[in-house]
Swiss-Prot record:
Motif RxLR-dEER mapped to chain: 57-75
Name this protein carries in UniProt: RxLR effector protein 54
Domain remark text: The RxLR-dEER motif acts to carry the protein into the host cell cytoplasm through binding to cell surface phosphatidylinositol-3-phosphate.
Disulphide-bonded residues: none
Stretches for region WY-domain 1: 97-150
Protein source organism: Phytophthora infestans (strain T30-4) (Potato late blight agent)
Subcellular location: Secreted; Host nucleus; Host cytoplasm
Motif (ATG8 interacting motif): 372-381
Keywords: Host cytoplasm, Host nucleus, Repeat, Secreted, Signal, Virulence
Region WY-domain 2, residue ranges: 151-198
Role, per record: Effector that specifically binds host autophagy protein ATG8CL of the ATG8 family to stimulate autophagosome formation and subsequent autophagy rather than blocking autophagic flux. The pathogen remodels host-microbe interface by co-opting the host autophagy machinery which plays a key role in plant immunity. PexRD54 competes with the autophagy cargo receptor Joka2 to deplete it out of ATG8CL complexes and interferes with Joka2's positive effect on pathogen defense.
Amino acid sequence: MRFQSIMMLTITCAGTCLAEGLAPSDQAYRPTMTGLKSRLNDPRPLSTATIATSSERFLRFDTVARDTAGNDEERVGPSWLAKVDGLMHKMVTSSLSAEEAQLKVWIQSQIHPRELFGVLSLGKRAAKLDDNPDFVQWLRLVKDFRANNGNQAFSDLDIYYLLLKTNSPEQLKLLFETLRHTPGMTKIGASMEKSLSGNWIRKALEQDTYPTIVYNTLRLKDAGTKLDDTPMFRQWLEYVEKYWNKNAGAFFGDTQMLTLFQKTMTEEEDIIKLVHMLRNNPGMKSHADKLERYLLLTSESSHKTMADVWLKARETPEEVFRILRLAEKQTAAADDNRMLNLWLRYTQTYRDKIDKNAFSDAEALQFFRKAKPLDFDWEIV
């Protein structure tokens, strides 16, 4: 078969390098940034097993039937296979190392880095930021692809969110710093660091750019459940604060912000955790409290989850009382009663799980009466 013929050519190409003393195919790669840097500069070819496996995955790729989640392995059609077949024949007759030959095949085939990411299954087995040879080769392809097609053809944000699927923001920060100090990779490393620096805030403020537009421009929806960990989200929160200070009474408010979060994360628990996290930001604390109360009033299912989040954060009954703003007179007595009952239940749970000496029933009632004298609108049950 044509596929088997190409595979034999790939293995033949790798065999030449094996004779020169390659490491065993099962050699472990140390998960260190030093290892990554050395691989980026190391002219040695890949192991036979790695080349054969990577090439096999490459040859099975079909750009028409591609899953954006990284499950990109479908059989190719005759035209794609013939194109790669010809390229592989040319590589066999060259004096390039197996690693260089493989990279040249990818470059000449004009495969997109996002597609190759799926072909190599980097999304499945994680693009660990170490000396993984497939990942190193992918970085080299990205560099060449951007040089030939411009950075916007595969932008810094494209790279960031693709790698964020399998790595933490801290790991990515270290990767880009390493690339900036790696010969041949300094340009892409510097570009990535600049894109994550937050230099855009001043210009966006000058233009009074609507926060939703900024959110979408930064593609924060792509961060998913890692939204809170991404530097761009922290920068966006800073921008929103400054936007509010500059544009008092701006249309963009708490509910618009919550809508963005709900479009980014589908699970209510993740949204509640994110909203409560906003309380750690002094400029966002009051907005977070409003959002928590809004969620409690509009979603019965949020009550238990919210209480669990409070418990995990070890919020005291006094602090939860302030979050619920029970000392304030509300427009609807029924809402007040719901919030009061929620607070009383939380106080009991806090006493059971956190501090058995905190707030007896009598103390809770005394605290409440002191904070808000009872009137006829209230019914404690």
